């Protein structure tokens, strides 16, 4: 038997006493809610906060921010937003990542939500889609965007280095952003730069970022693509 008070498990075992409500789970499995570590429910939760496709599979936490996050947004990014939307259309009424998360909470959603700040989002905010390194001043502004997001509750910095314009960022840029997240106990999480011929080098880059920034790091969907690269996972 499992005893629950409010939103906490307070007892597991037999003879736990009586309760105001009893659920007969005979023949069923009882587990904590599942975490969707790479969620793209950013738009669908706006359309339908019930999150039926995930909540009915036991998902209770949507973690967003694989390289791209719903904030911070510049005026130019807001202007581009309608043309980048798919079947789900909506007005962008927020600017920062924290404001987006608050928007979802105020709207009402079934799942819990959390987000990394996207390294791509920060880069576009300051550099647009330019294939170049940021200037000292631009990098400082990018770091301040990360700082603001961390203070709003971001989990850390997320990157997706296999896509443009994300792969325009070099290792030093990612270290600089991650150092700010590290100050708040955040993490660096990445869709690494290569899952094929440069797989080992891509993993080495993530380790370098973690060491230089003093931050914990994780890899999204760790895999090696192509039979010639399978042994690299060893």
Mark where each language-model region is.
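Generic beta-strand/beta-sheet core signal
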Residues: 5, 12, 64-65, 116, ...
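A structural micro-motif
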Residues: 20, 28, 111, 186, ...
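Divalent-metal coordination cores built from histidine and acidic residues
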Residues: 28, 47-155
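Histidine-rich, glycine-flanked metal-binding segment
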Residues: 1-33, 48
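Metallo-beta-lactamase
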Residues: 33-42
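Residue-level detector of flexible, active-site-proximal loop/helix-junction positions
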Residues: 16, 29, 120, 224-226
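Histidine/acidic residue-rich metal-binding segments in metalloenzymes
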Residues: 133-159, 165-234
């Amino acid at each position: 038997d499992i005893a629950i008070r409010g939103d906490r498990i307070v007892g597991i075992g037999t003879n736990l006493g009586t309760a105001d409500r009893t659920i007969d789970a005979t023949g069923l499995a009882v587990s904590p809610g599942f975490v969707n570590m790479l969620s793209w429910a950013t738009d669908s939760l706006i359309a339908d906060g019930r999150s039926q496709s995930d909540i009915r599979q036991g998902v209770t936490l949507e973690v967003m921010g694989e390289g791209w996050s719903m904030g911070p947004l510049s005026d130019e990014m807001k202007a581009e937003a309608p043309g980048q939307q798919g079947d789900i259309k909506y007005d962008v009424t927020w600017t920062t990542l924290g404001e987006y998360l608050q928007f979802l909470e105020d709207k009402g959603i079934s799942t819990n939500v959390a987000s990394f700040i996207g390294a791509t989002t920060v880069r576009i905010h300051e550099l647009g889609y330019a294939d170049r390194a940021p200037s000292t001043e631009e990098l400082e502004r990018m770091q301040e965007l990360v700082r603001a997001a961390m203070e709003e509750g971001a989990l850390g910095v997320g990157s997706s280095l296999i896509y443009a314009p994300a792969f325009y960022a070099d290792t030093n840029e990612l270290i600089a952003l991650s150092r700010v997240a590290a100050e708040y106990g955040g993490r660096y999480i990445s869709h690494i730069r290569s899952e094929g011929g440069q797989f080992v080098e891509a993993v080495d880059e993530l380790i370098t970022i973690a060491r230089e920034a003093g931050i914990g790091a994780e890899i999204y969907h760790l895999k090696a693509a192509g039979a010639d690269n399978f042994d690299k996972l060893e």
